[in-house]
């Protein structure tokens, strides 16, 4: 009989490993909205909307953890961060501000919601037309706030 024992594996570096920067989710994502079937799109000029073509380069997003349950969402091609302004508009900022952080929550229907950390009752949302929905017009239970993260590997 072979002797049994415990095999120990090498520990990962404290920074989370060298494969990707700490805090970054490994692969870029597309955020598919349940309302109208649009992918969240961040344009280089700062506009935010939805588009149905998953091949559009501006739907490739990098989600980065700021702290537990809080993320920033960066357009890979646009090199801008999703932000919610004080009037509820969505736009893309060149640099990270307090308006760029969102509470990410997995809902019971397996869709994610992204609620503004600064304006805590407002959500990222897309209308059935593909336009963003003002944060002040959003709330729990709306299809417009439900997003399914999908892989955006090339």
Curated annotation (Swiss-Prot):
GO cellular component terms listed in the entry, alphabetical order: extracellular space; nucleus
GO process terms (BP): angiogenesis; angiogenesis involved in coronary vascular morphogenesis; behavioral response to ethanol; branching involved in ureteric bud morphogenesis; canonical Wnt signaling pathway; cardiac muscle cell proliferation; cell migration involved in sprouting angiogenesis; cell population proliferation
Principal place of residence: secreted
Region (Heparin-binding): 127-143
Modification after translation: Phosphorylation at Tyr-81 regulates FGF2 unconventional secretion.
Location(s), subcellular: Secreted; Nucleus
Gene Ontology MF terms: chemoattractant activity; chemokine binding; cytokine activity; fibroblast growth factor receptor binding; growth factor activity; heparin binding; histone H3K9me2/3 reader activity; identical protein binding
The keyword Transmembrane appears for this protein: no
Propeptide cleavage-removed residue intervals: 1-9
Pfam families: FGF (PF00167)
Gene3D superfamilies: 2.80.10.50
Binding site for heparin: 35
Cross-link (Glycyl lysine isopeptide (Lys-Gly) (interchain with G-Cter in SUMO1)) at residue(s): 94
Keyword annotations from UniProtKB, A to Z: Angiogenesis, Developmental protein, Differentiation, Growth factor, Heparin-binding, Isopeptide bond, Mitogen, Nucleus, Phosphoprotein, Secreted, Ubl conjugation
Protein family: Belongs to the heparin-binding growth factors family.
Subunit and interaction comment: Monomer. Homodimer. Interacts with FGFR1, FGFR2, FGFR3 and FGFR4. Affinity between fibroblast growth factors (FGFs) and their receptors is increased by heparan sulfate glycosaminoglycans that function as coreceptors. Interacts with CSPG4, FGFBP1 and TEC. Found in a complex with FGFBP1, FGF1 and FGF2. Interacts with FGFBP3. Interacts with integrin ITGAV:ITGB3; the interaction is required for FGF2 signaling. Interacts with SNORC (via the extracellular domain). Interacts with glypican GPC3.
Function: Acts as a ligand for FGFR1, FGFR2, FGFR3 and FGFR4. Also acts as an integrin ligand which is required for FGF2 signaling. Binds to integrin ITGAV:ITGB3. Plays an important role in the regulation of cell survival, cell division, cell differentiation and cell migration. Functions as a potent mitogen in vitro. Can induce angiogenesis. Mediates phosphorylation of ERK1/2 and thereby promotes retinal lens fiber differentiation.
PANTHER family the record matches: FIBROBLAST GROWTH FACTOR (PTHR11486)
Name of protein: Fibroblast growth factor 2
Source organism of this protein record: Mus musculus
């Amino acid at each position: 009989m072979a002797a049994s024992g415990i095999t120990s594996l090498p520990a990962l570096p404290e920074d989370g490993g060298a494969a990707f920067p700490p805090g970054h989710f490994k692969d870029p994502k597309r955020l598919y909205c349940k309302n109208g079937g649009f992918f969240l799109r961040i344009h280089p000029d700062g506009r935010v909307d939805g588009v149905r073509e998953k091949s559009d380069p501006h739907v490739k997003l990098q989600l980065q953890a700021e702290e537990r349950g809080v993320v920033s969402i960066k357009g890979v091609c646009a090199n801008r961060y999703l932000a919610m302004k004080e009037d509820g508009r969505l736009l893309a900022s060149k640099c990270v501000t307090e308006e760029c952080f969102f509470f990410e929550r997995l809902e019971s229907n397996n869709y994610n919601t992204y609620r503004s950390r600064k304006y805590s009752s407002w959500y990222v949302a897309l209308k059935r037309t593909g336009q963003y929905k003002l944060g002040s017009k959003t709330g729990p239970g709306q299809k417009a706030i439900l997003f399914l993260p999908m892989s955006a590997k090339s």
